[in-house]
Curated annotation (Swiss-Prot):
Subcellular location: Secreted
Disulfide bonds: C23-C57, C30-C50, C37-C54, C59-C93, C66-C86, C73-C90
Protein name: 26 kDa secreted antigen
Xref: InterPro entries: PEBP (IPR008914), PEBP-like_sf (IPR036610), PEBP_euk (IPR035810), Phosphatidylethanolamine-bd_CS (IPR001858), ShKT_dom (IPR003582)
Organism: Toxocara canis (Canine roundworm)
Family, per entry: Belongs to the phosphatidylethanolamine-binding protein family.
GO terms for MF: lipid binding
Source organism, top-level taxon: Eukaryota
Function statement: Binds phosphatidylethanolamine.
Signal peptide bounds: 1-21
Chief place where the protein resides: secreted
Length: 262
């Protein structure tokens, strides 16, 4: 990658407040109407029209009417039933605490509807904000999600609390970045930033480490990313939403996170 191309990439993606181009869908306006994906009867129209356009409204469930039951996700009586019945069809009730923990809107603008399964050595599981030690997360984990074998996905892991929980002015620190993943076979994707374990510095408070998966509308083939290898000095300041917007990835498909401190 030339110096010019790499400078362009950094300007586009590694400035979290930067402005990236919007979803290229002028006909159906799917991105603007994404908030109605789960509102009947409009949702049925949007689901059929927009599923592949901007990766919005990917819920295609007619039998269980899961989309209409989304308001029950916070109801202690009905949530277990809704989650059991609808998790696999529409990924509902899987917000994973992204809003209450502040990941929305700091990292992404909406919570993913599915959960990423993240397992470190000795069967240590990431579970929606649980606290893990640096020793427990020292090695690259096994990461899987509900994937379609013919689709391509992007995996991102970031720390939005860098350099410290009280002072995250440098933006998100990139810990892992793989694009064009077939299904959930991460080894078959293109690694732009190799996995880097979370090692928060002493006296910097509790850090959130966020895993995000985006479903790609097509393979990502951009001169900005060809032959890119992100250096350690370039990891701070990554913009997850800027990247997703630049490549029309829509909302995050799946996610999870844990907390850790020195």
């Amino acid at each position: 990658m030339s110096v010019v191309h790499k400078a362009c990439l950094i300007a586009l993606l590694f400035v979290s407040s930067g402005v990236a181009q919007q979803c290229m869908d002028s006909a159906s306006d799917c991105a603007a109407n994404a908030g109605s994906c789960f509102t009947r009867p409009v949702s049925q129209v949007l689901q059929n029209r927009c599923q592949r356009t901007c990766n919005t409204c990917d819920c295609r469930d007619e039998a269980n009417n899961c989309a209409a039951s989304i308001n029950l996700c916070q109801n202690p009586t009905f949530e277990p039933l809704v989650r059991d019945r609808c998790q696999k069809t529409c990924g509902l009730c899987a917000g994973c605490g992204f809003i209450s923990s502040g990941i929305v809107p700091l990292v992404v603008t909406s919570a993913p509807s599915r959960r990423v399964s993240v397992t470190f050595a000795n069967n240590v599981q990431v579970n929606c904000g649980n606290t893990l030690t640096t020793a427990q997360v020292a090695n690259q984990p096994t990461v899987t999600w509900e994937a379609q074998p013919n689709d391509r996905y992007t995996l991102i892991m970031v720390d939005p609390d860098f350099p410290s929980a009280a002072n995250g002015q440098q933006g998100q620190r990139l810990h892992w970045w793989v694009i064009n993943i077939p299904g959930n076979n991460i080894a078959g994707g293109t690694t732009l930033a190799a996995f880097q374990p979370s090692t928060p510095a002493a006296n910097t408070g509790v850090h959130r480490y966020v895993f995000l998966v985006y479903r790609q509308p097509a393979a990502i083939n951009s001169p900005l990313l060809n032959n890119l290898v992100v250096q350690d000095s370039e990891r701070p300041g990554f913009g997850t939403t800027a990247f997703a917007t630049q490549f029309n990835l829509g909302s995050p498909y799946a996610g999870n996170f844990y907390r850790s401190q020195a």
